[in-house]
């Protein structure tokens, strides 16, 4: 009977996910009960993350203290791996990795180089940033000067936000007790960094290059991605003021960019206002980058012979 109930449970979960995908595609509100349950699951995901050993521990015990213990052990393993890196850069790696949580807690979340060293030279640290990215430890999100396709053309290599590759590890590096605060939705913590970290992971996992936009005149957009031939601005809102987004409004009004749509991921159900679609944060995983099919094309050059 357990096999039958387990199979029935799997079918139900698939049905729920199919229904959520349908709501995402049609931009229709989710059943309120399902929405609340999905938000609960999302908050749990912010704590547990996706590291296999951590997920396994949670499934076995449901004990968040055990989850935290394993996460902190993984963080220590990262430090040991860093120690094996060549001695010239080990210190830089240590510093950068240690600073990620506090840098993300800053208002604009950008990695401030001067926090590493008052006499900072990007060229001196560049290999360390590359190592953290290539090792799958960190996710850089680069600033672009213009929200125009191709985004790569206006990318700044030395202006970026640096997220961790696992949101659960990020949560574990903050103060003790944060896990309960997340579950209880307490107001005195900065959920913005954790929400944005989860968003960066999902976007990267679905094949998107990670960028954000910032200008003194218009303000900052949390993420900009290339989607279906256009630039798609994404705002990640962890609080109640999810309809307040001055930078997004400025960019959408700018006729130079001709951006057709923007998405705001928040705690609320689906709604649409003009060009902006408000979506529950747990739906960010439904954004998928287009896969290019094989396209074979050849030119007959025989006439040139």
Predicted features by range, described:
Residues 1-12:
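Single conserved hydrophobic/aromatic residue that forms the stacking wall/gate
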Residues 230-232, 261:
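Structural motif
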Residues 268-305:
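Domain-level recognition of nuclease-like catalytic cores that cleave nucleotide substrates
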Residues 51, 56-228:
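Accessory nucleic acid-recognition modules appended to NTPase machines
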Residues 238-279:
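Catalytic cores of nucleic-acid endonucleases
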Residues 10-36, 296-304:
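Charged, glycine/proline-rich intrinsically disordered loops and linkers
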Residues 212, 233-236:
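Short catalytic-loop micro-motif centered on adjacent basic/acidic residues
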Residues 21-74:
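Amphipathic alpha-helical "lid/sensor" segments that cap RecA-like P-loop NTPase cores
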């Amino acid at each position: 009977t357990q096999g039958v109930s387990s199979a029935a449970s799997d079918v139900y979960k698939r049905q729920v996910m199919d229904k959520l995908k349908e709501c995402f595609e049609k931009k229709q509100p989710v059943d309120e009960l399902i929405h609340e349950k999905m938000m609960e699951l999302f908050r749990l995901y912010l704590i547990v993350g996706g590291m296999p050993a951590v997920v396994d521990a949670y499934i076995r015990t449901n004990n968040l203290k055990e989850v935290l213990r394993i996460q902190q052990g993984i963080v220590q393993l990262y430090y040991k791996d860093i120690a094996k890196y060549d001695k010239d850069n080990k210190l830089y790696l240590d510093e950068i990795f240690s600073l990620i949580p506090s840098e993300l807690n800053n208002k604009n979340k950008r990695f401030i180089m001067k926090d590493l060293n008052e006499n900072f030279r990007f060229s001196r640290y560049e290999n360390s940033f590359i190592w953290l990215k290539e090792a799958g430890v960190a996710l850089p999100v680069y600033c672009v000067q213009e929200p125009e396709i191709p985004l790569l053309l206006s990318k700044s290599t030395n202006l970026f936000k640096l997220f961790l590759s696992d949101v659960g590890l990020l949560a574990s590096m903050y103060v003790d007790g944060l896990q309960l605060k997340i579950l209880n939705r307490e107001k005195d913590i900065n959920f913005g960094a954790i929400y944005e970290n989860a968003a960066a992971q999902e976007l990267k996992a679905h094949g998107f290059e990670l960028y954000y936009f910032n200008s003194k005149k218009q303000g900052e957009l949390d993420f900009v991605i290339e989607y279906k031939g256009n630039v798609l601005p994404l705002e990640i809102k962890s609080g109640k003021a999810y309809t307040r987004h001055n930078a997004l409004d400025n960019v959408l009004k700018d006729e130079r960019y001709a951006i057709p749509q923007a998405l705001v991921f928040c705690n609320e159900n689906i709604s649409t206002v003009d060009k902006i679609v408000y979506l529950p944060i747990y739906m960010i995983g439904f954004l998928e980058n287009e896969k290019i099919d094989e396209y074979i094309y050849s030119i007959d050059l025989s006439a040139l012979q």
